[in-house]
Amino acid sequence: MILRAMVAFLMLVSTVSYAFEKCPEDATKCSTTTLGKLEYISGKSQSDKQSRILLNGNEIFKSDSYQIGEEPNGDGFVLDKKHNINKLIVYYKFNTQQYIKTDPTYGDLYRYRAYRLFDFSGKEVVISNEFYPPADYDAHLKWVSWGQKNSVITFEDGSRFKYENGHVTMINNGESDTSENKQ
């Protein structure tokens, strides 16, 4: 009986200590994925002003941005059976905004952020191409329909994207959206 209690206590202690493993000091956030530990390092804290993402301590992504992280609305990821992140949408905010066009009413329009989808479901991480909503240049992620073969990503401006085989393509630019999705 005492031996069972000791084993249960040791299992509890090891589980709790693993769950509260600290992020490195220069990382802004850490997450556990199907392939291991993910660390976000924002460019504003780096001498070269480049944001980075590390997987198990190895750099897998770098961008000219001052901030990087998981999309915060709660739909930007899907978990595997062990409750680790399997697919994830990452946003990053550019160091230098990107000129898009001049609008007669609003003047010059700029893009401040972009997105990529990270897929940890295979033996190696797959990082999608860069994508962003075109109709409203500061639209946030609204919802994601995660699937085994493909996923649909929708933004607040009504634009929709499809992720399949490591690539994201726009399937609706949001300009003709009259449904309840555009609010």
Residue ranges and their predicted role:
Residues 61-67, 127-130:
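A short beta-strand motif characteristic of beta-propeller blades
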Residues 34-44, 85-109, 148-156:
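Short beta-strand elements that form the blades of beta-propeller/WD-repeat-like
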Residues 48-51, 113-115:
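Repetitive beta-architecture junctions, highlighting loop-to-beta-strand starts
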Residues 5, 18-50, 57, 120-183:
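Acidic, small-residue rich beta-repeat scaffolds with periodic aromatic anchors
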Residues 106-122:
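Beta-propeller blade signature
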Residues 14-16:
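N-terminal signal peptide c-region/cleavage motif recognized by signal peptidases
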Residues 70-79, 156-158:
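Signature of short aromatic-glycine-proline-rich micro-motifs recurring in repeat-based ectodomains
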Residues 2-12:
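Sec-dependent signal peptide recognition
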